[in-house]
């Protein structure tokens, strides 16, 4: 567990994760609007040495960044309501990209109610992250890793 006291601290945590990230990693982010999911992704991108400006792909659903140490696939499922919409948009192929790091905002929308997150990313390292708003400036960030 990590308590972030500012957006900069959230970015710094993400940067540490980005530095340790390896091909095939999947990071699923959950939390309310404004909890800091995109700030964490900005840090992950910085740790991966991504040069491009990172912002939430809420309307595009997906942003690919190929200018860093590893490709970063940043998905935002906020506007996606069903698995059929994910498939129609071609998003499922990005959930477990072996050649890069996939970060999924609103990952709970991807979860299949009858199967676990782990089975959907079999063979990948999965970090499940929950961001909670504690105050205007503080966030509780809890995470759990599974897989190789």
Regions found by a protein language model. Give the residues of each.
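Hydrophobic anchor at the beta1->P-loop junction of P-loop NTPases
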Residues: 27-29
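Short beta-strand-centered segment that lines the nucleotide-binding/catalytic pocket of NTP-utilizing
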Residues: 50-65
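N-terminal pre-Walker A segment at the start of P-loop NTPase domains
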Residues: 1-16
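Short phosphate-coordinating micro-motif centered on Lys-Gly-acidic
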Residues: 1, 46, 81-148
């Amino acid at each position: 567990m990590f308590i972030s006291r500012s957006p900069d601290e959230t970015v710094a945590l993400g940067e540490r994760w980005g530095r340790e990230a390896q091909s095939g990693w999947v990071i699923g982010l959950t939390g309310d609007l404004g909890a800091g999911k995109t700030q964490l992704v900005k840090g992950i991108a910085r740790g991966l040495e991504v040069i491009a400006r990172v912002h939430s792909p809420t309307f595009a659903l997906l942003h690919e960044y190929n200018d860093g140490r590893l490709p970063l696939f940043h998905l935002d499922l906020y506007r996606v309501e069903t698995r059929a919409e994910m498939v129609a948009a071609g998003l499922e192929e990005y959930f477990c990209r072996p050649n890069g790091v996939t970060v999924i905002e609103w990952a709970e929308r991807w979860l299949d109610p009858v199967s676990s997150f782990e089975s959907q990313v079999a063979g990948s390292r999965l970090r499940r992250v929950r961001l909670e708003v504690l105050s205007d400036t503080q966030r509780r960030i809890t995470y759990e890793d599974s897989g190789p």
